[in-house]
Amino acid sequence: MHLDQLLQNIPAKIYGKVESIPVRNLTRDSRCVGVGDIFIARQGQFCNGNDYSSQAVANGAIAVLSSLYNPFLSVVQIIAEDPIALEASLAARFYNNPSRHLDVIGITGTNGKTTVSCLVRELMERSGRRTGLIGTIEHILGENRIIDSFTTPDAILLQKYFAEMVKQNLSAAVMEVSSIGMALGRVRETEFLAGVLTNITSDHLDFHGSLEEYIAAKKQFFASLPEKGIAVVNLDCEYAPSFLNGSQARAVSYAIHQEADYRADRLKLYSSGSSYDIWYQGQVFPCETSLIGEHNVYNVLASLAVVHQFLGRDFADLVRDVRFLSAPKGRLDPILLGPFPVYIDYAHTPDALDNVCRILLQLLPKDGRLIIVFGCGGDRDRVKRPLMAKVSEHYGFSFVTSDNPRTEDPDQIIADICKGFSTDHYVVESDRKLAIEKAISMASDKDIVLVAGKGHEGYQIFKHQTIVFDDREVVCEALAALC
């Protein structure tokens, strides 16, 4: 695409001569700018892109998008009152509005986004629809798989990923929609046909400031759904009705404890999975799955509801496919290589940790203990740190350690966590590898060890470096050392 085409009729003031020259790329990183690129100079959380505009021009940028005019730049300047919205608009135009050529399903909520996204994709694929995935664990763009540190990629990358899906002849996409991604405009210009709300509990208050603002960010997503779209909500979540009030999409509900379009009852939860009945339009459909725990009953209900409404496939056939679904990596991931089971889970909020611990408590042999290794991420919601301790203390013995400290002092994060303990049933070990090893050394054959917080992640982030670190590998090595 050429610069004059890209900038045609955009809501911005243009300074400089706009020529018909090829645009190679859009980028927000001045270090990645090459000849023919447009540099997006945005105010970020930790730095201001305007400080790097000159470097971007020196590297070959042919235009700069900003909210501030810089008289010292020699290239075209695109000055917008809302550069976040314009960035998304330019990205969509540059990649030929790829989401219009895909049936896009968005999944939002505090917990369960990753599992529901993966289950929806599996059900879509089993129904004959080639479906991409944008999510926490990975992005699946057809034959290409990409690991990214963001649940919801920035607007430019997102449109690029959608374009790759279209290029590879995919017809649908499922993506996790985070509250931060909504607030930062990452999904603007993405045309969704369906949305799912999993649940709402307190999270990301460091970014949003309050629970009300956090909920408001997620409501934006449902408000953006078209009239022909589908809004699927969990009626056991007290905030669900307010999400429907602001949406013009067709409402669809699921629940366990409330009357809903799709409702599960007669739950039987086992160490190897679960079975239950699903009620839909007065009929009962028996469901069996290898997914463990009540929270996964919700995840299956959400996935079935949106895929059934989306595709109109026979519901009995769809329910039968559930038996073939598997949990994503790092979600109640069992390691059964020693005298006791060890579970890896991504739980990093009080609610998620409570759900996982409650499930594992049901699997404990008589006189067994639940031993929990956990920490909290740095530069993230500090309010939840002592709450995590309260949850862990309620269910078992705790090893408090580092998660991803990022720019914070790991010992200070641990001190914040420990304020939530009311007993001395915990040990502090800031080295995560040592904490896991000590927990496994402490366990007996009647115990269960839970390593929580990082799940699928293969790294650990510190202030000055990111190291290779995989909870599963550490657990396997520690169990092997017992033999």
Curated annotation (Swiss-Prot):
Question: What is the enzyme's main class?
Answer: ligase
Q: Where does ATP bind?
A: G109, T110, N111, G112, K113, T114, T115
Record's superkingdom?
Bacteria
Keyword Cell division part of the UniProt annotation:
yes
The pathway where this protein functions is: Cell wall biogenesis; peptidoglycan biosynthesis
UniProtKB keywords: ATP-binding, Cell cycle, Cell division, Cell shape, Cell wall biogenesis/degradation, Cytoplasm, Ligase, Magnesium, Nucleotide-binding, Peptidoglycan synthesis
Q: Where does UDP-N-acetyl-alpha-D-muramoyl-L-alanyl-D-glutamate bind?
A: S30, T151, T152, S178, R186
- Name the chemical reaction catalysed here: UDP-N-acetyl-alpha-D-muramoyl-L-alanyl-D-glutamate + meso-2,6-diaminopimelate + ATP = UDP-N-acetyl-alpha-D-muramoyl-L-alanyl-gamma-D-glutamyl-meso-2,6-diaminopimelate + ADP + phosphate + H(+)
Might you name a Gene Ontology BP term for this protein?
peptidoglycan biosynthetic process
Single GO molecular-function term? magnesium ion binding
Q: List the residue ranges forming a coiled coil, or say none.
A: none
Protease among the record's keywords? no
Localization per Swiss-Prot or TrEMBL: Cytoplasm
Residues modified to N6-carboxylysine: K218
> What stretch of residues is annotated with the motif Meso-diaminopimelate recognition motif?
403-406
What is its biological role?
Answer: Catalyzes the addition of meso-diaminopimelic acid to the nucleotide precursor UDP-N-acetylmuramoyl-L-alanyl-D-glutamate (UMAG) in the biosynthesis of bacterial cell-wall peptidoglycan.
Entry's NCBIfam families?
murE (TIGR01085), PRK00139.1-4 (NF001126)
State what protein this is by name.
UDP-N-acetylmuramoyl-L-alanyl-D-glutamate--2,6-diaminopimelate ligase
Q: Which organism is it from?
A: Chlamydia trachomatis serovar D (strain ATCC VR-885 / DSM 19411 / UW-3/Cx)
What is this organism's lineage? Answer: Bacteria, Pseudomonadati, Chlamydiota, Chlamydiia, Chlamydiales
